């Protein structure tokens, strides 16, 4: 191995050494990086029993970047002291110096300087002593000289507190002769090439033994985002509970399906531009089920089905406005309308997981674009009790047991409830879902029988993902600030099924 001078020097010195060599000391003697000696040691280890190498760990002290600067130019407090002339210096000017803020407080603590607040031009700083000894610089230089152990523990701790000194673990090898030691070693071949086979040279060459315990190089592959991992678990839970997935391919939705079909009045604040993204082109939906539209119009403006309605002039042009859907309940309305056209009525359970869009302020728990999970059950005689039972079962399957229910208002559900879960990272209760029983004013115009009730709930995909993976800021989960290493390292999502506990279900 004539092409490796460090390895040759190691063998020569080991031949005459008494007992063995320390890799760090050898690196210093040879004037090379320690890693070069370590590489030579590992190369010799791969040859068999040429050497024996024992890995040793030693605590040592190193200067930080700031510590090296101070060892070279002096401490901040010493620099402040030297910058003050005999006639003193205005404090405001002193604070503008590179070492002013840190050095001033330390110099005051050392009683090297004083402040005269009665000076005519403002507080002025004067020297108290004629000369100083920069002990901080001296101690750091002592560490540089390899004499850190001579410092008192209190002195080292003070330097560490000021982030001038850091403790590191130095890993070295104690190298000694092996059973097959020789100063003349040859390189072992790692691969059998076609040329060796054709020429027959493989017969005379030493080959490196296979290491069947070594871990191979992992192939490059794609990584699922935590949202997709949690989404697959939610989808599996819905399928286990007997739900059918709804089509949700309408990112662009008409105001009719997004609002009017849900018995949400056209003057509702949620329909304002401050909450909704309206489209400029195409601005209007051209095709709507006009028979159903007329029934919805009559329910809004005149009432019916036991309701007084909203008593306002309902406008078709308002219902035609296109927007980015604000919730997947629009997809639920379409699914329920299709269900109502099938005779006779058959109970159904639907779910969807897809993107929705809200024109709202971004913060640690809100995005303008996020995923909504929605579950819908249509059957005869469903009540709020059925809804709470399903929610309890659903969230238990998610492994979320710290729940609170809070009465709420939705234009299209009555009664309505918000669902809260305790977020361990944020140390507060966060809303994870909304739920309720769809109003007759929404269901009956679709053509559903009068004795059919529909219970539904929705929640975002992002917040349960944050709870599962311990993420405190939603912008660390979605957006340009996402750390791709987090995506690579996130484990497979397993939403543990935990036993029910009435203590975890609290009414807010």
UniProtKB/Swiss-Prot annotation:
N-acetylalanine carried by residues: 2
Quaternary structure, from the entry: Heterotetramer; dimer of two heterodimers formed by FARSA and FARSB.
Cellular location(s): Cytoplasm
Gene coding for it: Farsa
Transmembrane segments: none
InterPro entries: aa-tRNA-synth_II (IPR006195), aa-tRNA-synth_II/BPL/LPL (IPR045864), Phe-tRNA-synth_IIc_asu (IPR004529), Phenylalanyl-tRNA_Synthase (IPR002319), PheRS_DBD1 (IPR040724), PheRS_DBD2 (IPR040586), PheRS_DBD3 (IPR040725), WH_DNA-bd_sf (IPR036390)
Main location: cytoplasm
Name this protein carries in UniProt: Phenylalanine--tRNA ligase alpha subunit
Positions that bind L-phenylalanine: 329, 372-374, 412, 438
Assigned EC number: 6.1.1.20
Annotated catalysed reactions: tRNA(Phe) + L-phenylalanine + ATP = L-phenylalanyl-tRNA(Phe) + AMP + diphosphate + H(+)
Cofactor(s) needed: Mg(2+)
Record PANTHER family: PHENYLALANINE--TRNA LIGASE ALPHA SUBUNIT, PHENYLALANYL-TRNA SYNTHETASE
Any one biological process term the GO annotation gives: phenylalanyl-tRNA aminoacylation
Family as reported in the entry's similarity comment: Belongs to the class-II aminoacyl-tRNA synthetase family. Phe-tRNA synthetase alpha subunit type 2 subfamily.
PROSITE patterns noted in UniProt: AA_TRNA_LIGASE_II
Keyword Chloroplast annotated: no
Source species: Rattus norvegicus
Binding site for Mg(2+): 414
This protein's UniProt keywords: Acetylation, Aminoacyl-tRNA synthetase, ATP-binding, Cytoplasm, Ligase, Magnesium, Metal-binding, Nucleotide-binding, Phosphoprotein, Protein biosynthesis
């Amino acid at each position: 191995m004539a092409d490796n001078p460090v390895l040759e020097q190691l063998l020569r010195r080991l031949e005459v050494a008494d007992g063995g060599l320390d890799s760090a000391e050898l690196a210093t003697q040879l004037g090379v990086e320690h890693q070069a000696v370590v590489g030579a040691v590992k190369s010799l280890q791969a040859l068999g029993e040429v050497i024996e190498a024992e890995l040793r760990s030693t605590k040592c002290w190193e200067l930080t970047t700031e510590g090296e600067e101070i060892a070279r130019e002096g401490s901040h407090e010493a620099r402040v002291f030297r910058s003050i002339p005999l006639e003193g210096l205005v404090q405001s000017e002193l604070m503008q110096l590179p070492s002013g803020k840190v050095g001033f407080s330390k110099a005051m603590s050392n009683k090297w300087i004083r402040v005269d607040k009665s000076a005519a031009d403002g507080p002025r700083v004067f020297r108290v002593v004629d000369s100083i000894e920069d002990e901080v610089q001296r101690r750091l230089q002592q560490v540089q000289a390899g004499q850190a152990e001579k410092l008192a523990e209190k002195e080292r701790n003070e330097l560490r507190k000021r982030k001038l000194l850091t403790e590191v673990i130095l890993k070295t090898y104690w190298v000694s002769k092996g059973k097959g030691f020789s100063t003349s070693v040859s390189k072992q071949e790692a691969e059998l090439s076609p040329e060796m086979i054709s020429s027959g040279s493989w017969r005379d060459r030493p080959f490196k033994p296979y290491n069947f315990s070594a871990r191979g190089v992992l192939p490059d592959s794609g990584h699922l985002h935590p949202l997709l991992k949690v989404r697959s678990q939610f989808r599996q839970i819905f399928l286990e509970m007997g739900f059918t997935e709804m089509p949700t391919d309408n990112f662009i939705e008409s105001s009719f399906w997004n609002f009017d079909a849900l018995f949400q009045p056209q003057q509702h604040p949620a329909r304002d531009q401050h909450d909704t993204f309206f489209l400029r082109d195409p601005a209007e939906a051209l095709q709507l089920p006009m028979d159903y539209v007329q029934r919805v119009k009559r329910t809004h403006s005149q009432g019916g089905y036991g309701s007084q309605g909203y008593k306002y002039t309902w406008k078709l042009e308002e219902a035609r406005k296109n927007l980015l859907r604000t919730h997947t309940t629009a997809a639920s309305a379409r699914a329920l309308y299709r269900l109502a056209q099938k005779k006779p009525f058959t109970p159904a359970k639907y779910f969807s997981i897809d993107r929705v869009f809200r024109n709202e302020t971004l913060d640690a728990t809100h995005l303008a674009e996020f995923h909504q999970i929605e579950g819908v059950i249509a059957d005869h005689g469903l009540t709020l009790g059925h809804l709470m039972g399903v929610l309890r079962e659903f969230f238990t399957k998610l492994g979320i047991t710290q729940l609170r229910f809070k009465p709420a208002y939705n234009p299209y559900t009555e009664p309505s409830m918000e669902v809260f879960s305790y977020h361990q990272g944020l140390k507060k209760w966060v809303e994870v879902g909304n739920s309720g029983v769809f109003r007759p004013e929404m269901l009956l115009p679709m053509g559903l029988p009068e004795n059919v009730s529909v219970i539904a709930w929705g929640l975002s995909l992002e917040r349960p993902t944050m709870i599962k993976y311990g993420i405190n800021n939603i912008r660390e989960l979605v957006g340009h600030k996402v750390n791709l290493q987090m995506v690579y390292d996130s484990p497979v999502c397993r939403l543990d099924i935990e036993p029910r506990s009435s203590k975890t279900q609290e009414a807010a």
